[in-house]
Amino acid sequence: DQHKKDTLAAGAGLCDIKAVDVLVSEGPEAVRKLIAQGAVFDKSETGEIALTREGGHLRNRILHAGGDATGAEVSRALLAAVRGDTGIEIIEHALAIDALKSAGGDVCGVTLHVIGAGSRDGVGRALAKAVVVATGGLGQVYSQTTNPAVSTGDGVALALRAGAKVADVEFVQFHPTVLWRDLANRGQQPLISEAVRGEGAILLNQKNEQFMVGKHPQADLAPRDVVATEIFNQMQISGQP
């Protein structure tokens, strides 16, 4: 299967084979479930879901919504589904602080600080049979990142304090292409979608040279770590961002 081959190639020997098998075999059904939940993806003139390419892929297999607003659309659809389920309680404007543990040492909930008009102001707790830490990245520990303002690594810290083992923390992804402003700008920076290159855009250096040619067989659509490394090399050579 080409999708599996592409994933393993981009993983450079670091992939969990079982996880890759789950990704490529269950991915299409997961997309169908998202559509059933109300997610709307961009379509071609024929009415089929429009697919494009991103780094590391040899085929067009990336679907999108509203151009480059795919994440927002998926979040919208899932949040609407959650709000429509009377069996789920949503606590908004809440900062999870620490994991709660039972007398036996098992995690059984979290302490949280809820702030905002109309909310339960102050420190409280939420009990649960299972706690899933899904807090996103930690890019905001760096002065410049394409990660949103909420990507502060709080979830990783919470897990560490609870005694969980954290793996692969060195794999902090920096998106290769960002709209440069200047060094005075801190925090979240404007991301230039990889799909732009998937539709034919090319990367040029200060000399208008297509510098990814010869660096990787897929050139501008090489895996992100390869593209990011070569962009960094070009910056070092030119002394320019």
Where are the model-predicted features located?
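Extended, hydrophobic alpha-helical segments in both membrane/secreted and soluble proteins
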Residues: 128-131, 151-158
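Conserved redox-cofactor binding core of oxidoreductases
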Residues: 35-122, 127-130, 134, 178-182
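An anion/pyrophosphate-binding glycine-rich loop and adjacent beta-alpha core
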Residues: 158, 164-241
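Flavin (primarily FAD) binding-site architecture
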Residues: 133-146
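A short alpha-helix-loop-beta-strand transition element characteristic
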Residues: 14-19, 31-48, 89, 165-168, ...
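Generic structural signal for well-ordered, non-membrane alpha-helical segments
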Residues: 16-31, 67-75, 124, 148, ...
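Glycine-rich active-site loop/strand segments that organize a redox cofactor
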Residues: 1-23
